[in-house]
Amino acid sequence: MEQRWGLLRKVQQWSPRPSQTIYRRVEGPQLENLEEEDREEGEELPAQFCPMELKGPERLGSCPGRSIPIPWAAAGRKAAPYLVLTTLLIFTGAFLLGYVAFRGSCQACGDSVLVVGEDVNSEDSSRGTLYWSDLQDMFLRFLGEGRMEDTIRLTSLRERVAGSARMATLVQDILDKLSRQKLDHVWTDTHYVGLQFPDPAHPNTLHWVGADGSVQEQLPLEDPEVYCPYSATGNATGKLVYAHYGRREDLQDLKAKDVELAGSLLLVRAGITSFAQKVAIAQDFGAHGVLIYPDPADFSQDPHKPGLSSDRAVYGHVHLGTGDPYTPGFPSFNQTQFPPVESSGLPNIPAQPISADVADRLLRKLTGPVAPQEWKGRLSDSPYRLGPGPGLRLVVNNHRTSTPISNIFACIEGFAEPDHYVVIGAQRDAWGPGAAKSAVGTAILLELVRTFSSMVSSGFRPRRSLLFISWDGGDFGSVGATEWLEGYLSVLHLKAVVYVSLDNSVLGDGKFHAKTSPLLVSLIENILKQVDSPNHSGQTLYDQVAFTHPSWDAEVIQPLPMDSSAYSFTAFAGVPAVEFSFMEDDRVYPFLHTKEDTYENLHKMLRGRLPAVVLAVAQLAGQLLIRLSHDHLLPLDFGRYGDVVLRHIGNLNEFSGDLKARGLTLQWVYSARGDYIRAAEKLRKEIYSSEQSDERLMRMYNVRIMRVEFYFLSQYVSPADSPFRHIFLGQGDHTLGALVEHLRMLRSDGSGAASSGLSPGLGFQESRFRRQLALLTWTLQGAANALSGDVWNIDNNF
């Protein structure tokens, strides 16, 4: 037995000691005492210990005298937890540093890195990534300046009246051009609309009328083809009154001077307001008819620039609305049944354009008080008296015809959100040559199609779909655009992201204006800093504006006018839109809507800079399309509407005392505005703290952002009765403008009631005010609730 114990002790002496601390699970504080415990339990390492610097199993056992290197393995295992912990700390620190840097760069540049090499059905990103500067370079490299000028010249030479046979030929030519591009879809959309044209057999006439009512000398209307579409037909007789621009304040000034307006024929200057607004206001004040002329004072007096001939009249429709006025609120498809109604925007009085020469003859016959100095124009022989003057008889024989019009569409599908559309369009038709009116826009549109098609061939693919549209019927009040919106409204308000209009984009080379939704103002500012000024070398468009006006948006940004196709997108469909244009420094383009709107006159007006200005517009529009179609997060400033509401509320504050005296308050409006601002700020914080690589989350945010404009369409009025439901931009009793106008009656005699649909003299009505306030408040509150997202996130303390 003693021999056995002795042998066992010898074996234990030479056998490697099993280290419990290496192989057992060590956690928490025990880890700190690991090496100390090992030293206490074990012996000193042998002198022949090999340090752990092996790179593979082939070197195991390389130490002399040891076949099983358990001692050095034990030391390696002792160091392993420290190595793991150190690696984790380094990795975590690097990850956090990279994350913060990435978030900061995204916040600073607004999604400046655009992945354009992805495929719809593949996660493979091996095709590469293009940065914003690369994408800009690609776009500018393919954009062709010379092609656009040639297209403007050739298009202006072609007759293209809406619905005409020659227009059909142009449609086919454009379709042929599009078919040669790398596009996913090309198609047309035909509507049968009611258009009004002059009757060649029975032209419109204007006669003097004697004191006994007899028809006397006929005044020449030089061009019988110049007319006002949608004017009331028949004859109107009355004494002539000069009414400046025919604005509401102009007619109120005439009433204050005891000039009789009821039963008169008003002579008004073209400009400032649309033809339709002039006629509607004249009708409100009881006039029997309207004559509209171009005064030389409204155009450039530069002798080096061409001017409008004094025997030319200006064309313009007088429907206070957009689309086919004989199917209001409904699309004009063939064989579709409609209720027998007409648009409330159709006038009940006739209107006719006349030349400056004819207006001069009329003004010289006027008596009565002399017009204010600011009302006087530049007709040399005219004293500019207010009237009344001799009697006149106006006869309008326009006739309505059912006419097919065709819109042309081309599409590049997006790879990530193909069901969201970024739309850009331009009017194609024109009453005359229409170089500035529609040839410029058509040329830019076709060049952008070609440019983006070339980019697609070079690997570019937008995240969202690009939709290019050539509109017909624009000269009759954006008929083609509005009918398309009416036909597909239930789809478009969910899918259309933004509309960009190219109409009237080059009317000069001096000032730049953007008529737009507030959602696009910040993006426009950013893009202006990327586009070179066409007439100030070394400056961007933003530099050009900011140099003279530190508050650039006050100088550049304007509300959308009703005579723009962009207006229907926003006020009717709830889609944010923009229409931008270059204009003369101090005067309007004189040839718009005349037969002198030729390529030659446009070229002379811009003194040879037409190609440069057109190129600047194309660059601006193209870069807008790139940002809107490819940024992961839509670059729409939804928070800006909070400032818009605040500005409008400022107009209401002046009446708070009057309302308080009647026991009324505007507190609900203030509360709704506060809820909207809080919802916008909350959404902004959610987006900032989110990962842009999360496609599902980004899509959820984009859906909420792109519908903000739609939230401001009143849900409490019928689209058929009030098609322009936007509470800031629309028309009707539900709008903020109508509410302010009604409040003004608290301090007036009610003379403005007619414009709000009331009989003159009724004045302020408390029941009507309460209804207006409710419609406005709940539309604002609905916008705030929708922006909040899910119902459990809504602030219900209203």
From Swiss-Prot:
Glycans are attached at N235, N334, N535. SUPFAM superfamilies: PA domain, Transferrin receptor-like dimerisation domain, Zn-dependent exopeptidases. Residues 103-798 are extracellular. One of its GO terms (molecular function) is transferrin receptor activity. Gene3D superfamilies: 3.50.30.30, Transferrin receptor-like, dimerisation domain, Zn peptidases. One of its GO terms (biological process) is positive regulation of endocytosis. InterPro entries: PA_dom_sf, PA_domain, Peptidase_M28, Peptidase_M28B, TFR-like_dimer_dom_sf, TfR1/2_PA. Keywords: Cell membrane, Disulfide bond, Glycoprotein, Membrane, Receptor, Signal-anchor, Transmembrane, Transmembrane helix. The chain crosses the membrane at residues 82-102. Belongs to the peptidase M28 family. M28B subfamily. Mediates cellular uptake of transferrin-bound iron in a non-iron dependent manner. May be involved in iron metabolism, hepatocyte function and erythrocyte differentiation. This is Transferrin receptor protein 2. It comes from Rattus norvegicus.
